[in-house]
């Protein structure tokens, strides 16, 4: 790679399905993917949303160590700490409050003090929730139906204490501060409804790991996380696949890891549940947003190639339209103080060929499932095919897979 060029990795959100990202990272860093010319890579730029934010921060916080060793350590964390194993008391991400079955779990049976401590805390939290909701129900002027519906709140029964502890123990702020890699994490301002991108320096020196926790706070399941007094939730609400931030950080070769397949490969269920419908709606929104970003990347290549030929008037009507749209964005970027030497971009896309479980799968942390997702991601990277997944390559338009 020539001077000024950087390799970047973009990690999407998707809860437990994030184990798939670990498999792809493992293949890329071990040099077994055709996307890297079968050469191991050690990316300089990472961006991530939700679970992708955790994976990205983990990789960046281990800067200075061989990337192969770091991905193997990340895999071990997923299979030993994140996963729900026969000897663990639940998973490493969330706990269901007041669940009596945990006392029958062999892993919990071996940790009676932890179970007792959790039970006391859960009782307190549920009592607090009941008092607050009861007061709201009694004093609200809304209709009885509206007040009854307002009592439904999954957040009351979900504790994020496990992921709080996981992030605090696995992501060192001092290590982030020393890292030579670039990191950007996406989170959504729950008050203003705007996206915020947290840089590595902001996380290490100002806001701490709360930014990573906020990026993974799935609305309706986990409560908003206050960062500098402002509530933030999952970055996937507004930007589930932060490609443009990676390009702005200087990445010229970008590896995007999606956690959902091409929409056309996901068969519509004849009798979908509400969760199925909501999940497909989100997938369509995410697909639309990231397709625009991929087209921008292809447009940057087009502009540079037309300028090299010195004859933009010879372009097709579609090329000319793309030229004008992307040229305007490049001009705005430069006028806002982001002037830089634009380079041609290479974008490789990785995604599962079938649905990983859709809505319900994002909370399924069973070890066997996570191990299978790691293997799937690894194999998909080993068998990477631009003709199937879609790539942006200099001199070529985005492949058919770019249209999700």
Where are the model-predicted features located?
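Patatin-like phospholipase
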Residues: 2-8, 16-155, 161, 167, ...
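Short polar catalytic/cofactor-binding loops
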Residues: 13-16, 191
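Acidic, Ser/Thr-rich peripheral helices and adjacent loops at domain boundaries
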Residues: 268-309
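Short hydrophobic beta-strand that contains or immediately precedes a catalytic carboxylate
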Residues: 11, 46, 232-234
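Active-site gating loop/helix substructures
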Residues: 135-251, 256-257, 263-276, 362
